[in-house]
Amino acid sequence: MSAETVPQKPVLLTGASGALGRILTRALGEAGWTLRLTDRVAFPDPLPEGARFHLADLEDGPAILRLAEGCGTILHFGGISVEHPFETVIGPNIRGLYHAYEAARREGARMVFASSNHTIGFHERSEVLHDDCALKPDGYYGLSKAYGELMGGLYRDKHGVESAFLRIGSCFPEPTDARMLATWLSYADLTRLVMRATLAPSLGPDGTVVIWGASNNSRMTWWGRDGRDTIGWAPQDSADAYAQALEGKTSGNPVVERYQGGGFTGLDYSRRDDSGR
């Protein structure tokens, strides 16, 4: 296998036991990657050849440093993956992220960070956002992902750590509502995105790229310019085939339907005016 398809150094994948971690483990393992997997819960599937799993908590800094030894890339998919109270999010998503970046700094590794569309969730759907848009998180989860992108910028400016920020839309086996006709990211497109973010020779002159993580969906009119050409990624799948079944499947909540973040924007929403942002 060539260096164009397989990284020369091992790759550390955090959050390996989660839904997306399991998908990536299988796909990258089948591609011949040497994987070092970690999560705070046991890995539930058979390990692919070349993969080793280590039970560890992201809040255990020394453990994360040990796991990253010799790795050329860290795929940071660990942490809380949905909205939770701030005190629940802060440990794995803030402190754990810091430990991952410290490991990347020490190893000179590239960071591929599973960011989220919820970093910009309070932009309205009528807006077209580019990769340099203002961050408008729609909850504590999105706030933690926005913080992660800011931390990546700090570690690039101060330590030269490269980062690819993948603003993942809705990554599920298939779309399940009208919003996902725009935001859906297939598992195969996610895998190709992670591969290109890892294998690209450069992340551009700034050393950081933001990628909108959606498949080739004709209804995705909200997300514009990003760094996909820099890494050589083009989504191949599309939610369009599901349009007839899902087009009218909306929440009925005007807040949820106005903003790009969808259901997360409506959680604990208490604004009394209806003027938007």
Give residue spans per PLM region.
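NAD(P)H-binding glycine-rich loop region in Rossmannoid oxidoreductase-like domains
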Residues: 44, 52-92
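Alpha-helical substrate-binding/gating segment
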Residues: 168-174, 184-207, 216
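N-terminal Rossmann NAD(P)H-binding glycine-rich loop of SDR-like oxidoreductase domains
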Residues: 11-31
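Conserved C-terminal active-site "lid" loop/helix of NAD(P)H-dependent oxidoreductases
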Residues: 44, 209-210, 216-238, 248-275
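Catalytic helix-loop patch of NAD(P)-dependent Rossmann-fold dehydrogenases
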Residues: 91, 124-163
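Glycine-rich NAD(P)-binding loop of the Rossmann-fold in SDR/ketoreductase-type enzymes
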Residues: 59, 88-99, 135, 143-146, ...
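Conserved glycine-rich Rossmann-like NAD(P)H-binding loop of the short-chain dehydrogenase/reductase
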Residues: 32-44
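Conserved Rossmann-fold NAD(P)-dependent oxidoreductase catalytic core, especially the SDR/UDP-sugar
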Residues: 99-138
